[in-house]
């Protein structure tokens, strides 16, 4: 009797110790998120374990691994690490059906468990843009739709035009047939103009399964529009005798056909001097009869457009032509004559026969050179006249011939010199003789 009572006490003591030790053992797990087709790692850890077994089971409560022993025949499930403190397994090529709550069990008294939820992300398919039919006419309303399927959770769609995001769009989300993924679509409405031609409209799909590389679809717009026309002259102030080139700059889609040039609403009056080469109108030897309104017309399959240029031919500037001056050393007065010719005073007949290259050599530097030469000649002439006058003034006075020197009343040489240079007292007695 005593022996039986002692055995019972020992049994309860051992059970109490086991129960007390198991209270400090807890399995630890973490939730896992993986992209569809990826590999999930499920880890269960126990900090204090007295050689108690660990087990992983799937959402259907099927045992996957018991310690290091594989229980379910699934080639996708592999053992990563097995010890008394850790049991880790991997599930490769994860599908949406693998999502759910997995259980790690620690076989103590009682059994302790920890849950880990496996989240599988559905990767959205490459988006597709629909609704564009080329070409689109300028001013039309365009509607583009971007669509993607297979995302879980639902993906986000964003629109960009010229690298600028468009906010005002419509968004629609629908659940797929498997009731796990979503189909998302977005519609963009806008009115196009010629500036949209060649512009890329981008639909971008953002989703957490794509990391930093979003999926995109691009649509390049093709817009047809009427031509725009502008006339560019080769010189801003055309003059008589010059040549003038008018360039008709036209832009349109389709590209405009060869342009049409007219003057004052009619054909060009002088085809010999007014030559059309492509988009250019070349007018040779301008004259006043060329004045008028020139019109350039450009046409494509969408429409027609034109531009006008009013031509005013200016007169040739006045030209100064000085005459050559020959200096003279005589006492006669010197007269300087400058001849000025003006083109407006010439007759109509002479202007019509004028050589357009006759004024090519008369420019600013030649006029300055001629003016400088004239100034030097005038200065030398004036200096010569002044010196000649001084010379004549100094040699003016009384001079005696040889016959006069023998007369009784003839003054001596010294007196004659003095009278020639000094002041004269009696003007009536002086006589002038020239040798």
Curated annotation (Swiss-Prot):
Q: What is the protein's given name?
A: Cell adhesion molecule 2
Keyword check for S-adenosyl-L-methionine, yes or no: no
Disulphide bond pairs: 44-104, 146-203, 248-296
The gene is Cadm2
* Residue segments, region Disordered: 341-360
List, alphabetically, the Pfam families matched.
Answer: C2-set_2, Ig_3, V-set
Cross-referenced PROSITE patterns: IG_LIKE
Where does the Ig-like V-type domain start and stop, copy by copy? 27-119
Q: Which family does it belong to?
A: Belongs to the nectin family.
**Which organism encodes this protein?**
Rattus norvegicus (Rat)
Write out the PTM section of this UniProt entry.
Glycosylation at Asn-51 reduces adhesive binding.
In terms of superkingdom, the source organism counts as Eukaryota
Signal peptide residues are: 1-24
> Cytoplasmic side of the membrane: what ranges?
389-435
Residues linked to a glycan = 31, 51, 291
């Amino acid at each position: 009797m005593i022996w039986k009572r002692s055995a019972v006490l020992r049994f309860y003591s051992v059970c109490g110790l086991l129960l007390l030790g198991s209270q400090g053992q807890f399995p630890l797990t973490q939730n896992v998120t993986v992209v569809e087709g990826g590999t999930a790692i499920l880890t269960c850890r126990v900090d204090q374990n007295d050689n108690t077994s660990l087990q992983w089971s799937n959402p259907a409560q099927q045992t996957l691994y018991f310690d290091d022993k594989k229980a379910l025949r699934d080639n996708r499930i592999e053992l990563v690490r097995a010890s008394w403190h850790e049991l880790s397994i991997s599930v490769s090529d994860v599908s949406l059906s693998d999502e759910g709550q997995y259980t790690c069990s620690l076989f103590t008294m009682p059994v302790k468990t920890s849950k880990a939820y496996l989240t599988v992300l559905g990767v959205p398919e490459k988006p597709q843009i629909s609704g564009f039919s080329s070409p689109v006419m300028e001013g039309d309303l365009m509607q583009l739709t971007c669509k993607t399927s297979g995302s879980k959770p639902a993906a986000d769609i964003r629109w960009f035009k010229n690298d600028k995001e468009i906010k005002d769009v419509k968004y629609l989300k629908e659940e797929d047939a498997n009731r796990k993924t979503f189909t998302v679509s977005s519609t963009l409405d806008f009115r196009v103009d010629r500036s949209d031609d060649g512009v890329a409209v981008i639909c971008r799909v953002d989703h957490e399964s794509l990391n930093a590389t979003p999926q995109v679809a691009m649509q390049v717009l093709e817009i047809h529009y009427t031509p725009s026309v502008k006339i560019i002259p080769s010189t801003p102030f055309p003059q008589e005798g010059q040549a003038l080139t008018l360039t008709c700059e036209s832009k349109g889609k389709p590209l405009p056909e060869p342009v049409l040039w007219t003057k004052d609403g009619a054909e060009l009056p002088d085809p010999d001097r007014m030559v059309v080469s492509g988009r250019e109108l070349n007018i040779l030897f301008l004259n006043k009869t060329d004045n008028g309104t020139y019109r350039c017309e450009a046409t494509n399959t969408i429409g027609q457009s034109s531009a006008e240029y009013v031509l005013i031919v200016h007169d040739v500037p006045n030209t100064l032509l000085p005459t050559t001056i020959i200096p003279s050393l005589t006492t006669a007065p010197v007269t300087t004559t400058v001849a000025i010719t003006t083109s407006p005073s010439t007759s109509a007949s002479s202007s019509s026969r004028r050589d357009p290259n006759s004024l090519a050599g008369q420019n600013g530097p030649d006029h300055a050179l001629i003016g400088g030469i004239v100034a030097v000649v005038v200065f030398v002439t004036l200096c010569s006249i002044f010196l000649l006058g001084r010379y004549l003034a100094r040699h003016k006075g009384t001079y005696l011939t040889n016959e006069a020197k023998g007369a009784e009343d003839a003054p001596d040489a010294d007196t004659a010199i003095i009278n020639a240079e000094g002041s004269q007292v009696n003007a009536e007695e002086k006589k002038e003789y020239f040798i």
